[in-house]
Amino acid sequence: MENRFLIIMMVAGLAGCSTSAWAQRGDKKGQQQPEVWKGFDVPPASPLTPEEALKSFKVQPGFRIEIAAADPLVHDPVAMKFDEDGRIWVVEMRAYMPNVDGTGEDAKVGSVAVLEDTNGDGRMDKRTEFLSGLNTPRAIALVKGGVLISEPPILWYCQDTDGDLKADKKTEAFRGYASQGPVEHTENGLMPGLDNWLYNAKSTKRLKFVDGKVLVENTVFRGQWGIAQDNYGRLYYNSNSAPLFCDTIPGVYTVRNPHHPTRNGLGYRLWGDNSVWTGRLNTGINRGYQDGMLREGRLARWTGASGPVIYRGDQYPAELVGDAFIPEPCGNMIRLQKLTWKDGRPSGANAYDKAEWLTSTDERFRPVSLYNGPDGCVYIVDMYRGILQHKHYVTTFLRKQIIERKLDKHIGLGRIYRVVHTGQKRQAAPKMSGQDYEQLIGHLESGNGWRRDTAQRLLVERNEKGAPPILRETATASEHHLARQHALWTLEGMGGLDAPTIARALGDDHPRVRIAALRVAESFAATLGSSKADTEARVALLPALTEVAQDEDANVRQQVALSLPAIKAPGVESLLRAFVVKHAENSVVRDGLITGLAGRELEFLQRVGASEEWVTNGNLRNIVQALAGCVARQRNVVRLEQLLKLAQSLPTVGQVNLLDGINKAAFPKGRALKPVTFKSQPLSMASMAESDDQKVQELVARLSKFIVWGEAAKPPAPPRALTAVEQQQFELGKILYTATCGACHQANGLGEEGKAPPLLDSPFLVGPADRAIGIVLHGVTGPITVHGRQYNMSMPALQGFQSEHIAAILTYTRREWDHRADPVTVEQVNRLKAAEK
């Protein structure tokens, strides 16, 4: 216990280390940082009153910006939610970067406040502090009976039991939501999705609040700060210099088979070049000294894209519905990105030629999150401050400007703006808390996505007995396809689905309703038992599923492949096999089958393995190989032996196909999985080793390094045990890694797609210690190739760390995840530092 306390205190000391160390962690050794700002007449960064700030904005014709709330009513806002009566629940990160070194950032001064407009003039004039004393709160969700609030690493369920808008009860609902560390590199969002789950950025989890408890389910990792959805529940997110990505299918489908991870259908890039067009000089950015970052003193390209929103309101022109608004707080601007869809794939482009939707001449305008409002307008959360960059990445270049231009002064301010279209009157927010279920169902017909979402949430929370019959009618007979879609998901959340409603929805005129029907059919089928009524319900779905499997819409066909494996009903698997044979050229269809067969891959192969078309058709052959690979990765001796028996029973071409699939899984990109130990050589393997076909012989011979027996099955000698000092170093390294490196490289060492390469088995880490030390000391700039994948991002040097901290991090990572490399000593780090002086 004393040792752990000592380690924690060491980390605390590191967090508060001197200016010359911590504040320059963003620097790279030997990199020149010319003071380019001195060549421009940079205006003062004096704080403006909210009214003065209004004059600093330039918004495109047809729009007007208004103050919805402002200091002293708001302090350092980072996120918000509207409740059912139009009140704003704002999350305030009041300890964020209180000075250039971030000293005091661990203070428990954060809060969640409720803002109200009591006189109806459109500006919030009353503040009630719901909960205070929080450390870096970052997300909020309104749920049944209360509010979920994120305070890393805890997700609190907070309740107001007496109606005064102040939390009287605070219960730990989930531990492990967000880690303590760089703000923009930990979980955030808690965005209610169309499918009744809460989605997050910088996260691999989705959450659902049911009966007072938080359910947690794995999903795909996505985004950095902020997450949004469109009218069909598709998710959008971004990451610093990458302003917008879109998932065209629900990410949960891509992770349901741990032995076949895929990002197919995810992360579509929705921008062209990286150019931005700001309204002022932007020399005060972290890497403004780098070529291409500034254009005549103004930010030239995306560097700090933050919480986006997809427009779903009814106050702007209809042609903007589905377009994206993206804030760039480093450039004091907001982009309107026009999104178009063709053949199921999205693309995006700036709505204006070399201009932005909204710009400001005020350097302290920091739009960090955007939202759709009850009135159909876009709302802007402005953190309003000089310092935006977190201490973990501040460069000397930025630090000098912060001090010289007093960007560290005048903190604790904040604004929330509303942008109104001048062509239509803004509607007042409805008071939905007092409305009955019939009135709430009526809101599903609204053209305002916020109203539909809020009505769905309230209907699911209340779960009143009279609502399902009306919702079933809405799901099948409403004139508006969005209402039909929402009604289906509302029924799903209430447990009110039935087979006739789903069957009718599967034949709906609109493809997005058919997609929703397929998805809710999964949930419905999962609730059915073995009773006669439940069996009849399953059977009743088959005709409609058979019909939708012939759908002409490409998006619907993809959803068929994703949903059918999850629907356990008579005749569904044969329907699925026939469907995949017909549409195997679609990679999402192929992956949908493979991920959906998690745990059933062998049985499926046993049914199709002898079929000629599954051997001769290239796309079907790829599926067979992938399924064989899944069985191999399961490392189950019995199932692997059954797979080898299946291979032996096939003609030569079938043997090659299955053996090739096993080999590809056993030796991914040159790496080797841990061998599977058999008591003796499998007879089927011995038989194929005597094959007349040379290719079969080669594949079996290579496989003998993965399937082992006898002397070869003896485990390798374990790595030498760590000494007591090295073990303490390992424990310190684990804490430091989690607080810093783990934000990108992840707790499992698998890295972040498109950004941070995996550390697991990386030769850059477990190879020569000097190489690993050098990377940590100096950083690395891509492109860099790890396990056959190229990564083209930069990792800053960790020059703010002392030698003992670098040694600790490397000792931990070189021994974690079954690594066997030697620990790194402080002396090794010091030697390398001295050699470079």
Can you annotate each of these PLM segments?
Residues 381, 403-413, 419-735, 752, ...:
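Long, ordered, helix-rich scaffold segments
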Residues 402-404, 477, 751-787, 792-802:
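Gly/Gly-Pro-rich "capping" loops immediately C-terminal to redox-active cysteine motifs
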